[in-house]
């Protein structure tokens, strides 16, 4: 073994499994295997680059390695998000929708939880104090009742209600002048429960 310290690296294992699957033409078993969306995947992009410039092996290698490094970084964030959801995620009861709350700085937990079936996810960043509440786009609900109630309880934080009705966001990494909410995660969960009580 060249690097025994990488034996338990989940991200590297995921990357290796994916590359092996592609090498064995395993994508024929994917759902809607002939769908155009798969042309946007890494192995097809490398093939497209080869078609564009068939004589530049160095350019293809550089592009491929840059993409693989990026995928490895994304996988590391995803595996960490999965671990956090399992250890720190707190499902809470609503008549509808299925909901989960989590306190973490890892923003990947939001999307991953939604992909796992949670329709509403609320995340509070313990470092920044910001809060993000999101609904899956395919839900029949919107966050207007939640937004209205939060505005009654929080007059300090800067909140943004997305026109889709599926996102209600406090704080922003792009706009540093926005104020975090003083509400705790537990308080936000209680407000959400009140908003959707039947």
Question: Where would I find each of the regions flagged by the language model?
Answer:
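Gly/His-enriched, cation/cofactor- and phosphate-binding structural elements
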Residues: 74-198
């Amino acid at each position: 073994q060249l690097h025994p310290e990488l034996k338990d690296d989940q991200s590297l294992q995921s990357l290796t499994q994916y590359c092996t699957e592609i090498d064995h033409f395993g994508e024929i078993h994917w759902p809607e295997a002939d769908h155009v969306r798969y042309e946007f995947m890494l192995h097809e992009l490398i093939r497209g680059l080869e078609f564009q410039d068939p004589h530049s092996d160095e350019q293809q290698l550089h592009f491929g390695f840059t993409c693989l490094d990026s995928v490895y970084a994304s996988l590391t964030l995803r595996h960490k998000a999965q671990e956090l959801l399992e250890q720190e995620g707190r499902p809470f009861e609503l008549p509808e929708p299925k909901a989960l709350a989590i306190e973490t700085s890892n923003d990947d937990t939001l999307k991953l939880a939604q992909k796992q079936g949670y329709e509403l996810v609320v995340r509070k960043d313990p470092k920044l104090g910001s809060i993000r509440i999101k609904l899956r786009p395919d839900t029949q609900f919107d966050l207007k009742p939640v937004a209205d109630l939060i505005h009654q309880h929080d007059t300090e934080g800067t909140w943004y209600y997305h026109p889709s009705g599926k996102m209600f966001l406090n704080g922003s990494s792009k706009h540093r002048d926005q104020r975090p909410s003083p509400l705790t995660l537990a308080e936000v969960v209680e407000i959400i429960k009140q908003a959707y009580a039947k």
